[in-house]
Amino acid sequence: MEYNFQEIEKRVQGQWRKDKVYRVAEDTSKKPFYVLDMFPYPSGAGLHVGHPLGYIASDIFSRYKRLRGFNVLHPMGYDAFGLPAEQYAIQTGQHPEKTTEENTARYREQLDKIGFSYDWEREIRTCDPNYYKWTQWAFLKMFDSYYCNQAQQARPISELIEVFARQGNDGLNVACGEGVRFTAEEWTAMSEKEQQEILMNYRLAYLGDTMVNWCPALGTVLANDEVKDGVSERGGHPVEQKKMRQWCLRVSAYAERLLHDLETLDWTESLKETQRNWIGRSEGAEMEFRLAGKDCTFTIFTTRADTIFGVTFMVLAPESELVEEVTTEEQRAAVETYLTETKRRTERERISDKRVSGVFSGSYAINPLTGKEIPIWISDYVLAGYGTGAIMAVPAHDTRDFAFARHFDLPIVQVVVPEGEPATDPATWEDAKDSKSGIMVNSDFLNGLSVEDAIAQTKEYIREKHLGCVKVNYRLRDAIFSRQRYWGEPFPIYYKEGMPHALDEDRLPLRLPEVDKFLPTESGEPPLGRATGWHTAEGYPYELSTMPGFAGSSAYYLRYMDPQNDTALVSRSANEYWRHVDLYIGGTEHATGHLIYSRFWNKFLFDLGIVCEAEPFRKLVNQGMIQGRSNFVYRIKNTNTFVSYGLREQYEVTPLHVDVNIVSNDQLDIDRFRAWRPEYTSAEFILEDGKYICGWAIEKMSKSMFNVVNPDDIIARYGADTLRLYEMFLGPLEQSKPWDTNGIDGVHRFLKKFWALYYNTDGIRVTDTAPTKEELKSLHKLIKKVGQDIESFSFNTSIPAFMICVNELTAAKTTSRAILCPLLTVLSPFAPHITEWLWQELGVEGSIVTATWPEYNEEYLVESCVRYPVSFNGKVRFNIELPADMSKEDVEQAALIAPEAARWLEGKSPKKVIVVPGRIVNVVV
């Protein structure tokens, strides 16, 4: 019987569905293990071969853990809200719900074909009201909470209201925005609206004025990673910086916990470092600077207060409220022009771009330690959200300050020199000098001190003179949580007298209403402004913005634990059983977005007692990207003639991308090429050796480069098991690598050879004969190797091990059930269809999914013989096979009396013989 993968995979998948073999429930008799993929956004294009890489790896690990006796939770769902579906709806008039439903059906079909072991009864979609009910519920909990810095915990806002009524807000150690001081009497005398405005400074979900990336063409706020080079990633529309009233989450309150708890996680050090940098903890001081000629001060944060004597100018962020205060009439036009220019640049671009720009405000500040006036400039290399949005510039010891000073011809004063060296003239420098260590100069009472001592003494001086305070600062910002779009979660908020109020929980979910168009209204309101009756029963209007894309993905891993629960996000019992995600697989692009927000969300729920662990993802593995392998044809200019790759240098040619699906091993199928596009119907070709050979390059998979490979096509030609094995065979999971079908035939031939171990022309060839020592050695070597590979995520090295084992068993003409049954189990995580089929054919009870992983026996792995390379004067001349337990003396003697030795000894006695037991013999003549 031949290996008919199409019949096998169709029947096996049908049997799995019928028997519900992947259904999972809490089982206290088994140890739980939760494996999760970062769920996909269901785009209209469907999956290409790069998408399943991480899914296949997690599926192998899930199947392996089941075989090891674990109760494995391995679910899948869809991150279904988002901008792409809405843009498509605007272009076509189709409702996003309809296109999303079609796309998820397509994804499900593709995922099923690959044979994943998902428990589909736990499927979730973020656009399902029964799911986003719990996103809305979590938002309400944040709205009704504040963060107590002293307890390092979220607490009910009602407790804070009681404190205000008792003592006002003096001396409170809580996370808050800009606020005014008030007494208990003043609080009590406030109107409800005034009190609500005060509370907005403390809520974990709050309305605030913030700078955003505003895209007028799309009519919405965009995240930093949705903007590139000043335009939207989707559509290429201009984006500007704009201050807007937005819903925000006070993520910054959790900065220290987010940083500290990284040390408890089994993540790569590079990913942890990315998050550390994003959180950006820095210790320093806040200092007060007075405006010259005005009764006004402003605060700056610095990590190097000791360099205060090197300050030669101040810089404000363009968004700073102080800009209006410090700009003189003489400079107003120049400042306004500059502010308009900077609106077109995102924060991320401002951080990464090294070009120098700025404008003088016309005003001066007073250095609090020297009393000298220093000019105040405005520049976009200072960010409003970090520190106070104002900096003291020390150009001698900061690269960006140095570049700014050089560009605008501002003074540069050196205040730190390497120990034992004199100060030098900054006019001769090419860049700022390092100031992390050294001795202070030009710094008054700090002169002669080490940097470390100067930092400590300056902080003490600032405290004593009441010039500021010591402070820890974080780069991490609060998350902007509203989008002016339709296709997202509605906020469970209504407005009364202009102030937001929480919807009662028993009225959740607040469902998305129908609208006639998915565009902003004529008056500029978000699309929900088009909805009829978008208000409470009492007539109070609902919020018109919707939640951002990361809202639905911030706690989805919890819902998988208990997806049918109507009364809670997750029951206590389900959460205490599964606890956390043991293995999370996804791309590095989520390091500073989703992975920060999910950790924050989980910690908040932990504070409320909803979840039992503070961290959601115990181990995280980032899969690399499968890149496209593009092919090119070479058209002779001004003709429709194409020249083969090896002859292209002889002509003036233009390289053109060609569909990789009409190329095999870089050889173009000319007939299919002519049929591919009308303009190529009459194409002529100049061949080499009767073939048209294409050029190639490694590029991102993209429809525009015609290098997208559909997994359906691979499965139709080779089968899902071949696809699974080949994706793992391409290289280490964490590394990016090119997709290249040139090697897939070898993997498919391996499966045919594997099949032939079990079947011949007469049918099943497996017998109950006892295995030989060599067969046991081959099997147990494989069991050990593959188990270790899976545990270390080295899936690529398992594939050659399978091939070697099958070659050895084929050569041995193995038919023993004692060998071939365990072999099926070991291969089953990688190739589940062929192994399930053969398992059933061998009459083994139950599915191979519920089998037990075989344990290897070290006794079978002991080498009885060792193959020694024998060298003469350092060059290997022959090999000799000897018993593994032979003594060094006997190995030496055996090597010297071997028939091949006489030729190299030439009748001489060896000067020296070196024997490395089990490795090599070297004879010095």
Swiss-Prot record:
Specify where it is mainly localized.
cytoplasm
> Under which main EC class is this enzyme filed?
ligase
Binding residues for ATP: 703
Q: What is its EC number?
A: 6.1.1.4
Q: Which GO terms describe its biological process?
A: leucyl-tRNA aminoacylation
Q: Where is this motif: 'KMSKS' region?
A: 700-704
Work out whether the entry's keyword set contains Isomerase: no
Q: Where is this motif: 'HIGH' region?
A: 40-51
Q: Which GO terms describe its cellular component?
A: cytosol
Q: Which InterPro entries match?
A: aa-tRNA-synth_I_CS, Leu-tRNA-ligase, Leu_tRNA-synth_edit, M/V/L/I-tRNA-synth_anticd-bd, Methionyl/Leucyl_tRNA_Synth, Rossmann-like_a/b/a_fold, tRNAsynth_Ia_anticodon-bd, Val/Leu/Ile-tRNA-synth_edit
Q: Name one Pfam family in it.
A: tRNA-synt_1_2
- Top-level lineage group: Bacteria
The similarity annotation says: Belongs to the class-I aminoacyl-tRNA synthetase family.
The protein here is known as Leucine--tRNA ligase
Q: What is the native source organism of this protein?
A: Porphyromonas gingivalis (strain ATCC BAA-308 / W83)
